[in-house]
Amino acid sequence: HWKNNNTRWDILNVARFCYAFKKDSSLSWVVDDNSKPIFKLDRLAPANGIEHSDAHDAMADVLATIGIAKIIKDSQPRLFDYALSLRDKNEVSKKIKLFSPLLHTSGIYPARFSCTRLTTALAYHPEYNDRAIVFDLEQDPSLLVELESDELKKLLFTKKLPKGVERLQIKELIFNKSPMFVP
């Protein structure tokens, strides 16, 4: 929670979640030339009959966000309520179990995977108690125990890896950023 008990909630993450799990929803989806979904408010709002001609204007963005939220709430009330519950970092914390699988939806994952990956929480962050370190289970987990720490560091933090070298798929799931996931 923030000042005055306010919370944050990114409706685009909820839209990604809807796309990944409820493709039959009443939202209309925009795709690029490669048939990958586009999750940008200035594209999603007009595709769903929501006025958004003044994209990136604060008030226009707020109204478009409310319009998308209303469509999701009206068409998928249980999913909407679940997503809304994830605004509470304590609720998120209760749902995260170390080494248990969870489907995590986030803009950090490629659209070609519906921004969703099967992950597991490896640990809670050593410095911040409001986040967990998650690992993408599509990647070979033996890398975590077989590689030396210098090699792990390289696979995590090198900006541009050599061609053919896959980045280690470890991300932070931050509890107070309304993460979208299903345990």
Give the residues covered by each predicted segment:
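Acidic catalytic cores of enzymes that act on phosphate-bearing nucleotides/polynucleotides
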Residues: S85-I170
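Sequence-level motif detector for i,i+2 pairs with an aromatic at +2
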Residues: N6, N129-A132, N176
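Extended aliphatic helical segments
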Residues: V14, V30-V31, V62, V92, ...
